[in-house]
A protein has these predicted regions:
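N-terminal intrinsically disordered, cationic/polar leader segments
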Residues: 1-90
Length: 90
């Protein structure tokens, strides 16, 4: 199973780990961090927006986000980068 990551565990950032999952399994999303209880729905929407706009059509993914106060735009960029790395883009 291929895995890629983007981000860090520094303050105001997040670590996103994306792995391929079994075909037909869909997206499994795990969010962790102090702000998740308050911003879960917003964070989920951002991740799903990136997945839906994925030009390669990757749909069977396991995504883990460890949040440390990242802004929405940072989370979006980290998810995009991790998916690009999973596809083999630099």
């Amino acid at each position: 199973m291929n895995t890629a990551m983007a981000g860090s565990l520094e303050s105001m950032d997040c670590l996103v780990v994306v792995s391929e999952s079994e075909r037909g399994s869909g997206v499994s999303l795990s969010l962790d961090g102090a702000n998740v209880a308050r911003f879960r729905s917003s964070m989920e929407a951002i991740v799903h927006k990136v997945i839906d706009s994925n030009p390669m059509g990757l749909r069977d993914l396991e995504i883990r986000v460890q949040d440390h106060g990242a802004l929405d735009i940072v989370l979006e960029a980290r998810v995009e980068t991790a998916i690009a790395r999973l596809r083999g883009e630099s």
